[in-house]
């Protein structure tokens, strides 16, 4: 067969029946992303070489942008475990068309979060202490082990996608390994759902047990504060639509249809339903906190906020109503959900709402004065914190770009773009 010289030089590596841009355009895009990645690497080097003193963190704000970023991307990456649960355990077949992307996004979110934690712990050479000298009375221990194990599960789920590259899969051994991985995928999906559920909850439970921080302290059920359950529900209420948003962004950038509207709408319906369930419990929790728990501690609802915009009540109302109730209604009602503008707006608001929740639970909780001689404190992340965060986003863009170009992520792509 004569070679088609109109195709990119690496066309033999592309998924079967799929077109990609020229290699020169792709390399220009990768170089553009690598500029931001390089800036982040420099910031990471400065942090590792000189310590946390180069950041905006201090003795008052041990948690800041990095922990907010970690908690947000871990929640948004929940589309991986929840979509996997629905696809492989509950056998919702249409999700097979987007599950590969959900797995990659989950892997990027979790691996990126662990990379940020390497910087945030201050002394990465002692990172192994959390495993070897585990504090069995701390919810952070559960978080450490569950995140690590689930990241390994995501790697296992990502490997067969790599092995399905058109050229790699021609090897009989590689083909057999990839096939057997797929056969065992329901097992890994179940393990992933178990691990992710517990670490999502423990991240919330970690805040809920801090009785010295009235903004986040909660009573609960048995050994788990209510924030344990709220974190799980908020994650599954936002993760699926974040996957859809990433997919849509890729479609806009590549000019190709990757997933059918029916699949996106289904993901939105699932997210909207779970978001509404979360909001029911969130409203109940907020009411009980404001009218029962705070008064019993000798505090008032108004003391938890300032009159300014940084720690004002507007963020609570934005989280609950504009970025909570509004997107939930849009995603649940078919007539509203099937309007693309409303659908994508609701998805964006949903993700913003979860990010606000993680921010106020992390930063605002530390800013509130808890002693008579305390005052409201302010926190502003500096360039080193922003640089490291941008590095993770750039890392995700690099891996996702390579995966899209060379791996069969989207089963519907060839059919949707058939001329």
From Swiss-Prot:
It is found in: Cell inner membrane. The keyword Cytoplasm does not apply. Belongs to the NrfD family. One of its GO terms (cellular component) is plasma membrane. It is a multi-pass membrane protein. The gene is qrcD. Keywords: Cell inner membrane, Cell membrane, Electron transport, Membrane, Sulfate respiration, Transmembrane, Transmembrane helix, Transport. It comes from Nitratidesulfovibrio vulgaris (strain ATCC 29579 / DSM 644 / CCUG 34227 / NCIMB 8303 / VKM B-1760 / Hildenborough) (Desulfovibrio vulgaris). Component of the respiratory Qrc complex, that catalyzes the reduction of the menaquinone pool using electrons transferred from the reduced periplasmic cytochrome c3, and which is probably involved in sulfate respiration. Is likely essential for growth on H(2) or formate since the periplasmic hydrogenases and/or formate dehydrogenases act as primary electron donors for the Qrc complex. The QrcD subunit anchors the protein complex to the membrane and likely interacts with the quinone pool. The Qrc complex is composed of four subunits: QrcA, QrcB, QrcC and QrcD. Can form a supercomplex with the [NiFe] hydrogenase HynA1 and the tetraheme Type I cytochrome c3 TpIc(3), its physiological electron donors. Coiled coil: none annotated. This is Menaquinone reductase, integral membrane subunit. InterPro entries: Electron_transfer_protein, NrfD-like, NrfD_menaquinone_reductase. PANTHER family: PROTEIN NRFD (PTHR34856:SF2). One of its GO terms (biological process) is anaerobic respiration. The keyword Glycosyltransferase does not apply. It comes from the Bacteria.
